[in-house]
């Protein structure tokens, strides 16, 4: 057990180790999402959606591309939702030619980027202190039940649209599967659902995350507290110091890829500081324990409160209810990778037959988990998405 604790602790605090070295960084590593958008010459807007349980979620918007600034025609709306540990910044972490949000904006779409509770920019609440245990008492259940509905409904109200397109990566795919299968009114507001590196069941997960089942929840809470895990405060020090020095940079890359799938040739090492800033942004310990549960049990279900009596209190049954993915009827397109250690090919194969209205599924043999968002070849996926969006409008796929 000691070596497992050591490994997880290394990931948790290594940002403090790298702060001993100095180097230059990419300017975007210091920027909020809106500033990155402006940095590349695009118009940026910021909003806040308030969830039913009081969390304040930032929304970043690119209302138009560089070449359609003066267009008055109503634009189709796309919501991009980030994955585990990430922020909305993951969609703009590369230059415009290889960042999905910029590509969509230049193609004429009104692009919105959501931020899940507990990530770097989403640590505000109407009345809870972000330093309190109460603020961090959430898992992906609350993202499914509260975050996604609040985000989508805000966008619809602001744009006047009745439906939007949804793109979710990793956890962004998971909360879509959960929300759109349990909330049919919300599902009706989605034209087409795009899932990148989708996770639901995690039985075959590999890498550092696969160690989670070896931790008892009580011990995990003692070691990492009951608040935030993988704080961006620690990891963001990487973007201000040593991740461009060759030896240390290689260490950064190794840690970065150890959680997602090791295909280093797909990663632009000169931008690792930006990726770490926006792709290692923290979450709650309870969320991580929920993933531990999913890995250990191999099912997509609500959070297990640890006893039959507590489950009965929360769910009116002694065991956590399952998320029945089959109940999601939205036309869905999926992309998965053969080198993905989180969305393993065996888990994806288990998920595929449960997608009731799967219109497209592409497996890229050499893609890892993050290749779909920040990889050098991410534009291949962007091109596929644009083709399906065009087909959706012309052939009425939804």
From Swiss-Prot:
Glycosylated residue positions: 268
Covalent S-S links between cysteines: 243-252
Coiled coil: none
Signal peptide from the UniProt entry: 1-19
SUPFAM superfamilies the record matches: alpha/beta-Hydrolases (SSF53474)
Subunit structure: Monomer.
Protein keywords: Disulfide bond, Glycoprotein, Lipid-binding, Secreted, Signal
Main location: secreted
Gene3D superfamilies the UniProt entry points to: alpha/beta hydrolase (3.40.50.1820)
Keyword Secreted attributed: yes
Protein name: Tear acid lipase-like protein
A single cellular component GO annotation: extracellular space
Pfam families named in the record: Abhydro_lipase
Function: Female-specific protein which lacks detectable lipase activity against a range of substrates. Binds the hydrophobic lipid 1-aminoanthracene with high affinity.
Biological processes annotated in GO: lipid metabolic process
Family to which this protein belongs: Belongs to the AB hydrolase superfamily. Lipase family.
